[in-house]
UniProtKB/Swiss-Prot annotation:
It is found in: Plastid, Chloroplast thylakoid membrane. The keyword NAD applies. Belongs to the complex I 49 kDa subunit family. Its EC number is 7.1.1.-. Coiled coil: none annotated. It is a peripheral membrane protein. This is NAD(P)H-quinone oxidoreductase subunit H, chloroplastic. Keywords: Chloroplast, Membrane, NAD, NADP, Plastid, Plastoquinone, Quinone, Thylakoid, Translocase, Transport. InterPro entries: NADH_Q_OxRdtase_suD (IPR001135), NADH_UbQ_OxRdtase_49kDa_CS (IPR014029), NDH1_su_D/H (IPR022885), NiFe-Hase_large (IPR029014). NDH is composed of at least 16 different subunits, 5 of which are encoded in the nucleus. NDH shuttles electrons from NAD(P)H:plastoquinone, via FMN and iron-sulfur (Fe-S) centers, to quinones in the photosynthetic chain and possibly in a chloroplast respiratory chain. The immediate electron acceptor for the enzyme in this species is believed to be plastoquinone. Couples the redox reaction to proton translocation, and thus conserves the redox energy in a proton gradient. Its main location: plastid. The keyword Membrane applies.
C-alpha cells in the first residue's frame, strides 16, 4: 500500500470580506505555507461612498451629517475636524464654554471607541467574557450622549463657532458620577485581562513594529505611541483647550500587540482625568459664537405666508471659504485624523482631502503579518483598530 503524497504547494486563502474578525468589509488574500503566512494582499474599497466628492457640493453645515459615517464609532472627532477647518480658515473664535464642552464630548467619544475596540479584540483572541462587561460601560456613555445631543450615535452636535446646544440641567453631575464609576471598571478590566497568561501568550511579541518602521510608514495614534514615539497632537498642537488640563501621554517601548493594548487602556484613564477637570472648571457664557448666526428679518411678516414659520428659526451660517489652503488635524482614537481644505471664494470647498488614520495604519499590515502564524492575523489586525467606513471613505 502506497502512502499518500504530501502536497508542498503554497495555498491561497481568501479571508473576508464577510469574516467576523475583519471588523468591516475588508478582504485579505493570504498566501500560506501550512500555517505560516508568506504573503498578504489587502483588498479595499467595498465601503467607498465618495465622501470627498460629496463635500465639494455641500456647505459645511450640509456636510456635517455625512462625516459621522466615516468612523461611526467616534463621530465627535469627524465632526470636530469638519468645523475646525472652516473656523481656522475664516478666523472664527470659539467661546471658552463651547471649547470645554467639545473636549468633554471628544474624550467621552475616545473612551467609547476604545471600549468598542477592546471588546471585539478580546473576542477575536478567544476571551468572550470581557465583551459583555465592556458594553455595560459603553451604554452609560451613550446615555450621556443621548441626553446632551439627542442621539446615541451620529450626534451632529458640533457647529462652526461652538456646539448645537448647551449641556442640559444635571448632565454635569451625571457625567462626574460616570467618571468615578468607570475608573473601577478599568481596574476590573486590568485585573481580568492584563495578567491573564493565555492573553499574554496571544499578544506578547506578536506584530512587533519598531519605532523606525512606525515613522517610515507614517503611523499615528496608539500604533505610533506603542512603538516608543511619544507623539500626541493634543500636546503638540494644543487645539481646543487641552493645554489647560494636567494629563500624561501614554506610550510603550515594545511595539507589539500587548503594547498597543496597554496604550489604549492608559488613554481611557487619562481621558477620565481630562473630563473630570473640564467638568469641574467649565466656565459660564455662550455655547456658540453668536456672530456666526444670521437671522432672517422681515418687516411685516404675514402669519399665513409660506415663509412665516421659518422666521423665528436659526438658519445655518453660510459664508464664503476664503481663497487659501489649510491642513487641520486632531488626535482621533485611531490616530491623526486630518483634512486638507482648499477654498475658492465659494460656499463649497474646492477640495476636501481626508487623511484617515485607519487607512495609513492598515498599510503596514502585509509587512507585519509575514512569517507569522495564520491565527496571529486576527490579533495583529485587531490591535491596529480599523473601521472600514473611515478606510474606504
Amino acid at each position: 500500500m502506497t502512502a499518500p503524497a504530501t502536497r508542498k504547494d503554497l495555498m491561497i486563502v481568501n479571508m473576508g470580506p464577510h469574516h467576523p474578525s475583519m471588523h468591516g468589509v475588508l478582504r485579505l488574500i493570504l498566501t500560506l505555507d501550512g500555517e505560516d503566512v508568506i504573503d498578504c494582499e489587502p483588498i479595499l474599497g467595498y465601503l467607498h461612498r465618495g465622501m470627498e466628492k460629496i463635500a465639494e457640493n455641500r456647505t459645511i453645515i450640509q456636510y456635517l451629517p455625512y462625516v459621522t459615517r466615516w468612523d461611526y464609532l467616534a463621530t465627535m472627532f469627524t465632526e470636530a475636524i469638519t468645523v475646525n477647518g472652516p473656523e481656522r480658515l475664516s478666523n472664527i473664535q470659539v467661546p471658552k464654554r463651547a471649547s470645554y464642552i467639545r473636549v468633554i464630548m471628544l474624550e467621552l467619544s475616545r473612551i467609547a471607541s476604545h471600549l468598542l475596540w477592546l471588546g471585539p479584540f478580546m473576542a477575536d483572541i478567544g476571551a468572550q467574557t470581557p465583551f459583555f462587561y465592556i458594553f455595560r460601560e459603553r451604554e452609560l456613555i451613550y446615555d450621556l450622549f443621548e441626553a446632551a445631543t439627542g442621539m446615541r450615535m451620529m450626534h451632529n452636535f458640533f457647529r462652526i463657532g461652538g456646539v448645537a446646544a448647551d449641556l442640559p440641567h444635571g448632565w454635569i453631575d451625571k457625567c462626574l458620577d460616570f467618571c468615578n464609576y468607570f475608573l473601577t471598571g478599568v481596574a476590573e478590566y486590568q485585573k481580568l485581562i492584563t495578567q491573564n497568561p493565555i492573553f499574554l501568550e496571544r499578544v506578547e511579541g506578536i506584530g512587533t513594529i519598531r519605532a523606525e518602521e512606525a515613522l517610515n510608514w507614517g503611523l499615528s495614534g496608539p500604533m505610533l505611541r506603542a512603538s516608543g514615539i511619544e507623539w500626541d497632537l493634543r500636546k503638540i498642537d494644543q487645539y481646543e483647550c487641552y493645554d489647560e488640563f494636567a494629563w500624561e501621554v501614554q506610550w510603550q517601548k515594545e511595539g507589539d500587540s500587548l503594547a498597543r493594548y496597554l496604550v489604549r487602556i492608559g488613554e481611557m484613564e487619562e481621558s477620565i482625568k481630562m473630563i473630570q477637570q473640564a467638568l469641574e472648571g467649565i466656565p459660564g457664557g455662550p455655547y456658540e459664537n453668536l456672530e456666526i448666526r444670521r437671522f432672517d428679518r422681515v418687516k411685516h411678516p404675514q402669519w399665513n405666508d409660506f415663509e412665516y414659520r421659518f422666521i423665528a428659526k436659526k438658519t445655518s451660517p453660510i459664508f464664503e471659504l476664503s481663497k487659501q489652503e489649510l491642513y487641520v488635524r486632531v488626535e482621533a482614537p485611531k490616530g491623526e485624523l486630518g483634512i486638507f481644505l482648499i477654498g475658492d471664494q465659494s460656499v463649497f470647498p474646492w477640495r476636501w482631502k481626508i487623511r484617515p488614520p485607519g487607512l495609513i495604519n492598515l498599510q503596514i499590515l502585509p509587512q507585519v503579518v509575514k512569517r507569522m502564524k495564520l491565527a496571529d492575523i486576527m490579533t495583529i489586525l485587531g490591535s491596529i483598530d480599523i473601521i472600514m467606513g473611515e478606510v474606504d471613505r
